[in-house]
Amino acid sequence: MNWLIAKGKAKAKSNVSLAIYRCVDGKPVISSDHLVKLNQLSSGEKQIVSIFSQIYLELDKKYIVLFDEPELSLSIYWQENLLPDILSSGNCMFLMAVTHSPFIFGNTLQNFTVGMHEFIKK
């Protein structure tokens, strides 16, 4: 990692920390007994932490986000909220997802969806 930092290929973010807390009635409870460690997260939850860390830690960047089947390893709740949450970050200038899940676009993005059948010529 130090080699990558020296070559300008990576940045050291030593002043960044991340805390994840469980929610009660939809609100995070900031206490040590509600703290969730990264190794306790599912693979889908780890993907979400990774995506949002990148989007929110690089404040001076705008992203083009492309997903192929973003629903993999995600609960229905996260399938419904992932794309709207990314767009609401203010750091996403373009978003495209290819999915089999009806939950990914079954939200405020419904009007922006296009089915593959619309491109099939008969």
Where do the PLM segments sit?
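Switch/communication elements of ASCE P-loop NTPase nucleotide-binding domains
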Residues: S14-K122
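Amphipathic alpha-helical domain-onset/packing element
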Residues: M1-K13
